[in-house]
């Protein structure tokens, strides 16, 4: 190669080297900015101190559970309940699958030091003396999931290899989370919940009592276990709102049955009409001797919905709580209620403004009185349903 050729080759190689460096620098400059949502450990580089420090021999932190141990809702329910945009319920459930049942509270006694055994026994109660405790025997695992607890209740529990041994077991205590709804599991029935536990504006610090009024879907397929749970809850009366030819109760022996038919397809007139039916329904609700009651139509959503709406409203529940309860039907198999929420629920709330009263609760009272429900009976309902309320 001549001297001239060597110079030319050197210049070409130099240009190629500079081109590569330039390209690399351009690629580095064009990197997207760091993700602002990343955690500190993701967005910050590791320091020299961190690299050279002694290894951490402590146990790694466990991930926080998706649902707190004191909350009986499923993860999907929990996320929906704590989503401030509660009207966006179809993000979680669309009324096509059975998702309305609670997960319950897990009682895990695997760390209690019990010996290995063929079976285990757990006892739980709402008091530290274990008065009227529930005893569950024959458990093959060292845990048990308890269902249908009340919001905010105390729960005491202990375990052993048998009932006698359990009485000497370690006593655990927790307080159930207070955020509603109080949805329940009744085998063979969908869309079951107690309307209690919500705040009431009728009295400072007031709440809707739990265990008085349950809303459910049709109980036609209720099982023996479901019937037993109805009786365990102390329910005394069933109110069936379906079409007359569908009212085939009673469904549970020992529970009084009353059919108060509000025909299907009457959605546009349910606020203005059916005076006699509403009088009968609210007379039953006012009768403390008939409580607790469970009320249903077919889906436990629309006819059941307006009765529950009026009961919660007249008892001082807030709009957001009443709306959340109404939309929870989406977690059942009874179809989405998002369109009904707009066409019915919101209209009920708006139409109440035409009635006398300074508050929505008093406007709802005026609506009931316009149906022929005596004002004294409305006050009886309030005293019965709202903790701490006394009629003036």
Go through each PLM region and give its residues.
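Ser/Thr-glycine-rich phosphate-binding loops at phosphate-binding pockets of nucleotides
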Residues: 299, 303-304
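Cys-dependent protein tyrosine phosphatase-like superfamily
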Residues: 27, 31, 54, 59-293, ...
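Intrinsically disordered, low-complexity serine/threonine-rich repeat tracts
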Residues: 33-60
